[in-house]
A protein has these predicted regions:
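Acidic (Asp/Glu)-rich catalytic clusters
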Residues: 32-33, 59-62, 130-131
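Active-site-adjacent beta->alpha loops and helix N-cap segments on the catalytic face
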Residues: 1, 21, 45-62, 77-81, ...
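Catalytic beta/alpha-barrel core
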Residues: 39-52, 70-71, 91, 113-115, ...
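Catalytic domains of carbohydrate-active enzymes, especially glycoside hydrolases
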Residues: 27-40
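Short, acidic/polar
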Residues: 19-30, 118-128
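N-terminal small/glycine-rich loop or linker at the start of catalytic domains
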Residues: 1-19, 73-75, 89-100
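Extended, intrinsically disordered, low-complexity segments
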Residues: 89-112, 118-221
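Structural preference for beta-strand elements that scaffold enzyme active sites
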Residues: 7-11, 37-40, 64-68, 136-137
């Protein structure tokens, strides 16, 4: 059915209600036929069925279509998958009287059967979505932003709290050493060795180097 498009206050035209998925499919097919080798589709929630429904419609017309999917930190993964687990339990006829679907993020549910089932769904999400929706590559946008913010929050709480410097040593440096993380020798990772080689090349024994036998990085083996 043809409709006269209505212009929004922003100056853009509103899509006809209910056509959003159809438009995604059309755009994906057109992009592939124009030379694209991978698709990027955003979804409202990380739901394997929803992703697969869209991609499989694209593959009906372009059977080799492959998808890049953003495992986005914008999703509340815990809440979304607890809701999915809750709905699955209801569909299976299980007793869900111990849970309030509107409050599934509550810490009181963290070690429950539902929470464990939800975590298992998260654990297999990439494999499930790759199998069902032909996802070629999963990525996480902004993982370093969130991990840095979390770790600095934890470090600040400990460092300015009762643990003092132990907060850094126990949770950062010792972990780097035990796990063989190269960045524990941050001098080398920042290029000080290269700088020393450069100085030595031009100044020989007169070079004032950052490294050498007394370099603190030699404390790490």
């Amino acid at each position: 059915k043809l409709l006269r498009p209505a212009r929004l206050a922003s100056g853009l035209f509103e899509f006809a209600p209910g056509t959003n998925i159809d438009r995604v499919v059309v755009d994906c097919v057109a992009s592939l036929r124009a030379g694209a080798d991978l698709l990027w589709i955003e979804t409202a929630t990380p739901n394997v069925k929803d992703i697969a429904d869209m991609v499989n419609r694209v593959r009906e017309q372009e059977p080799t279509a492959k998808l890049v999917y953003n495992n986005s930190p914008s999703f509340n993964w815990t809440l979304n998958f607890r809701q999915q687990a809750y709905d699955a339990m209801v569909a299976e006829g299980k007793d869900v009287s111990a849970y309030d679907r509107a409050k599934l993020m509550s810490v009181e549910y963290d070690n429950t059967e539902l929470a464990l089932a939800a975590d298992q769904r998260i654990r297999t999400f990439q494999a499930d979505a790759s199998r069902e929706a032909n996802i070629f590559h999963h990525l996480i946008t902004l993982p370093t932003y969130h991990t840095t913010a979390l770790h600095m929050n934890n470090l600040a709480q400990g460092y300015f709290g009762e643990d003092g410097m132990l907060a850094y040593v126990l949770n950062v440096q010792r972990e780097e050493i035990r796990k063989g993380v190269a960045c524990v020798k941050h001098q080398a990772m920042s290029g000080s060795d290269i700088g020393d080689d450069h100085k030595e090349f031009f100044a020989g024994e007169a070079a004032l180097k950052a490294g050498g036998a007394k370099n603190t990085s030699n404390q790490f083996h």
